[in-house]
Amino acid sequence: MTEPTQTQPAVAADENQIIAERRDKLRALREQGVAYPNDFRPTHRAAELQAKFAESDKEALEANPFEVAVAGRMMLKRVMGKASFATVQDGSGQIQFFVTPNDVGAETYDAFKKWDLGDIVAARGVLFRTNKGELSVKCTELRLLSKALRPLPDKFHGLSDQEMRYRQRYVDLIVTPETRDTFRARTKTIASIRKFMSDAEFMEVETPMLHPIPGGAAAKPFVTHHNALDMQMFLRIAPELYLKRLIVGGFERVFEINRNFRNEGVSPRHNPEFTMMEFYAAYTDYRWLMDFTEQLIRQAAIDALGTATIQYQGRELDLAKPFHRLTITQAIQKYAPQYTDGQLSDNAYLRSELKRLGVDVTQPAFLNAGIGALQLALFEETAESQLWEPTFIIDYPVEVSPLARASDTVPGITERFELFITGREIANGFSELNDPEDQAARFKKQVEQKDAGDEEAMYFDADYIRALEYGMPPTGGCGIGIDRLVMLLTDSPTIRDVLLFPHLRRED
């Protein structure tokens, strides 16, 4: 038995003509009976068979015939007179069909020759190896289950238009193995996180997606209207305040993996709809959180990829090494050593320097900014993108951390960290502020900033203050950006690569 070289006929005809021809074939199928049958049940998947029989040679398969029923999308077809081959792809991988008129009947064979790439087909038969050693199904029954009306992209060029890959992700998944691998890794990552949290005795919960008051983060919300209650509502920007209400209620370890929505810009790192994991643990602080977060990310990499050493954009990254820890000013002086302690403590100098670096210091967020906020802005301009290796930036100023517990020893500083890897923020956590009077005062300060024009400043949440007044135990809480973590683990340069259906402008 000789196999032809695996090639795909060049598609010369106009796509509309191809679609018209396929619709004609579908009409003929309808005339024959059920065009889209749903009575075939596979017994095996391609990857399962490839793994199970990887060591079985041609003679072993002939001596022990193994019957299978397999279905999938036809990706290649080679018709050679009285013997033909088809490569069929299911959700796990690919396997080859071997088709002859003697085995499936002349009528079925003639029909098969008219089937198109992209059609969903099914076969029953026995496994064997071809002369080239490829595991194949020698078909004794062959059926067309679903007619594809649109042609797949050319095999050798694939789906080259990046926006089209995002807009028609279903096609991208069909023709691009790397895309399928990315989303399998995403699923493994989330499964690993869930197991890690469960093993640490955290309870998974679900909190509201519609909020009467947006809170838990500094962000601009999406606004909607609840018709039955006749009230303005907001898609949640963060679940934090609800999760901490649960800590008050006595659930001492909780987490949630879900969507947040922020009506802000789109960039390689930002999508208005994104997935976060937030967790809260009573009787912990931000140092415990850093240790826990480091272990969680390391384990997620091992579970998703089989190793803690990864490649990201051509550079190696070892997540098994201890993560670095720096304060904001330490990071600035490490990556921009020209700045002196005196300059970093000079409000006027920092404003002038930020302006020189292109930051608009006249925007509302900078109106009454103190040293801490200005230092943070300088850090973002000079050091953040340099944090390639995992680094916890610690001890954030109170004025930019309205929900974090203040340090007992350093005035103006909170027990807060942000984790950066490859220059991107991956996590944000802190010892929680559980003093209701301090929290109320910080909310009032946020309201003043909002009234001054800062759209991202927080609202005053009276019910959350009431919850704190019942007493919240000392608590640590952290949020991890799932999308950015998956970007890291899958070597994806943009967040759109790890979202199945990213937001795009309306199609013309």
UniProtKB/Swiss-Prot annotation:
Essential cofactor(s): Mg(2+)
Gene3D superfamilies from the UniProt entry: Bira Bifunctional Protein, Domain 2 (3.30.930.10), Nucleic acid-binding proteins (2.40.50.140)
Cellular component per GO, a single term: cytosol
Keywords linked to the UniProt accession: Aminoacyl-tRNA synthetase, ATP-binding, Cytoplasm, Ligase, Magnesium, Metal-binding, Nucleotide-binding, Protein biosynthesis
Coiled coil: none
EC annotation from Swiss-Prot or TrEMBL: 6.1.1.6
Binding sites annotated in the UniProt record for Mg(2+) 1: 418, 425
Matches recorded under CDD domains: LysRS_core, LysRS_N
Gene Ontology MF, one: ATP binding
InterPro entries: Aa-tRNA-synt_II (IPR004364), aa-tRNA-synth_II (IPR006195), aa-tRNA-synth_II/BPL/LPL (IPR045864), Lys-tRNA-ligase_II (IPR002313), Lys-tRNA-ligase_II_N (IPR044136), Lys-tRNA-synth_II_C (IPR018149), NA-bd_OB-fold (IPR012340), NA-bd_OB_tRNA (IPR004365)
Intracellular or extracellular location(s): Cytoplasm
Reaction catalysed by this enzyme: tRNA(Lys) + L-lysine + ATP = L-lysyl-tRNA(Lys) + AMP + diphosphate
Pfam families (UniProt xref): tRNA-synt_2 (PF00152), tRNA_anti-codon (PF01336)
Cross-referenced NCBIfam families: lysS_bact (TIGR00499), PRK00484.1 (NF001756)
Subunit record text: Homodimer.
Protein name listed in UniProt: Lysine--tRNA ligase
Organism from which the protein derives: Burkholderia multivorans (strain ATCC 17616 / 249)
